[in-house]
Amino acid sequence: DDLLLENNTFYKDVIDAYIRQPQDHTSIPYSDHTIPGLVYLSDYDLGTNDVAYYDQDVANYSLSTDQYEAWNKGWSYRNDGVDLQENSDATNSNGLHISFVEKDEWVNYTLDVQQSGFYNIDLRYATPQSGGQLKYLINGNDVSEQITLSNSGGWTYFTNHSTNNVYIQEGVQTFKIFVLGTTSFNMSSLNFSISNDPPPAMQAMGAITVSDERSVRLALNHPLNAQTIEVSDFEFLINGNTSNIESIQIDPTNSLVLVITLSDYLHYQDDLKINHAGGVINSVYNSLLGTLVNFPVQ
């Protein structure tokens, strides 16, 4: 009887883990996420830990420690490492939420964005304590500042936190929720809606090093006009010392990003900062990037 289809439940994540993931170390969508629209956070991409998501607890170590530890501590919906629990929230909910979040954990979602523009993002969350922290990234680049959550009244009392005027480009994009702090919270959905506000002032959102060990990606909140970026308008500091900048270019695949290439190689423990004079780099919304003083690079 166990072999009869009517006596079995289909779990697409289990099938994907057995058949695709051993040969294909990429992520694929779990569900279709059309933006503008609602994304249920339980429907993060399919893939292994550190590819589609990162969770601190992803395995059962009972054989080596003689102690059982669940990888999905919520015991619901999926067999991956992300902790999912059921809830009774009636707003923007499919009855599930991500729980037991810890610092540096993250989840990815493949979005099909119908039009470029500024979006308001409403996170549905619950927590009995203030101070939960997270940020949003698209294709590895920061698109939000640090987000700090307030006490919602309890683990089961869900409310919204709005992050407004986030620029998202049309097309298929990978959206990441990254947990920053040690204060835990539950999160169930994201609602993306087109902003009706005037464009915000242009600003730098974040900067990261890349794998060639000589380049840095500086993410902005506005797409840029085609223009020449003068090296002399920037200063790059490595451990407090000025480093020679070879070139600064707009990323040809993402006009929200400046690529800064250096003469010196970068090392893991280096303290990296960016200074910029301001008032010369123009966006498609005719907004100028302001002054940057000791802007940190991750």
Task: Kindly label every feature range from the protein language model.
Residues 2-203, 268, 298:
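Extracytoplasmic
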Residues 103, 171, 212-214, 252-256:
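Ser/Thr- and Asn-enriched, surface-exposed coil loops between beta-strands
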Residues 140, 240, 283-287:
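Residue-level detection of beta-strand-connecting loop/turn positions
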Residues 182, 197, 222-226, 265-266, ...:
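Acidic glycine-/aspartate-rich tracts in secreted/extracellular proteins
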Residues 199-207, 273-298:
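Acidic, Ser/Thr/Gly/Pro-rich low-complexity segments and short DxT(G/T)-type signature motifs
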Residues 213-249, 273-279:
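Short, surface-exposed alpha-helix to beta-strand junction/turn motifs within ectodomains of secreted
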Residues 255-269:
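A surface-exposed beta-strand-loop module
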